[in-house]
């Protein structure tokens, strides 16, 4: 098993993979879109690695910027019906904190990404809520109502969910929905 890989980004392949050169060996690693967007040719990166061996015996390496992303992936794939592709689609759009917050607050709209359907969302919420609460990750849900209302407001203004969530993450905790929307709009106008 590979725990981490540290090396130089040799090439960005497709929309979700890089070739990471470590000691003269190039590893093809799939990354969440949020992580991949920060990778450029020549960058030195350290990734936490999950290895998946498919039914056909072909191995796939999944890379994460931190342990939180890796642990979130591990939690998601334990849910019946969630495979690596589905979990990566979720992590392409949401940070682990946003995933945990959506689970605890039962925010179905936040989890409806990458073709994830209502039945699977229900299963994710029902199977992971006790686990998320057990690890006290529900501290991320403190601002969920404000965030959910702010996302809805930004969506109604024509922004995409990914952009809205990214802007709200950058502005951090706000006192009110209005304040969150105002700050997010300033962030989006940059």
Curated annotation (Swiss-Prot):
Region of interest called Domain III, as start-end residue ranges on this chain: 142-190
Self-association state and partner proteins as the record states: Homotetramer. Forms an RuvA(8)-RuvB(12)-Holliday junction (HJ) complex. HJ DNA is sandwiched between 2 RuvA tetramers; dsDNA enters through RuvA and exits via RuvB. An RuvB hexamer assembles on each DNA strand where it exits the tetramer. Each RuvB hexamer is contacted by two RuvA subunits (via domain III) on 2 adjacent RuvB subunits; this complex drives branch migration. In the full resolvosome a probable DNA-RuvA(4)-RuvB(12)-RuvC(2) complex forms which resolves the HJ.
GO biological process: DNA recombination; DNA repair
Notes concerning its domains: Has three domains with a flexible linker between the domains II and III and assumes an 'L' shape. Domain III is highly mobile and contacts RuvB.
Function text: The RuvA-RuvB-RuvC complex processes Holliday junction (HJ) DNA during genetic recombination and DNA repair, while the RuvA-RuvB complex plays an important role in the rescue of blocked DNA replication forks via replication fork reversal (RFR). RuvA specifically binds to HJ cruciform DNA, conferring on it an open structure. The RuvB hexamer acts as an ATP-dependent pump, pulling dsDNA into and through the RuvAB complex. HJ branch migration allows RuvC to scan DNA until it finds its consensus sequence, where it cleaves and resolves the cruciform DNA.
Organism whose genome encodes this protein: Anaplasma marginale (strain Florida)
Protein name per its UniProtKB record: Holliday junction branch migration complex subunit RuvA
Annotated Gene Ontology cellular component terms: cytoplasm; Holliday junction helicase complex; Holliday junction resolvase complex
Chief place where the protein resides: cytoplasm
Region (Flexible linker) location: 137-141
Renumbered residue ranges of the record's region Domain II: 66-137
Gene for this chain: ruvA
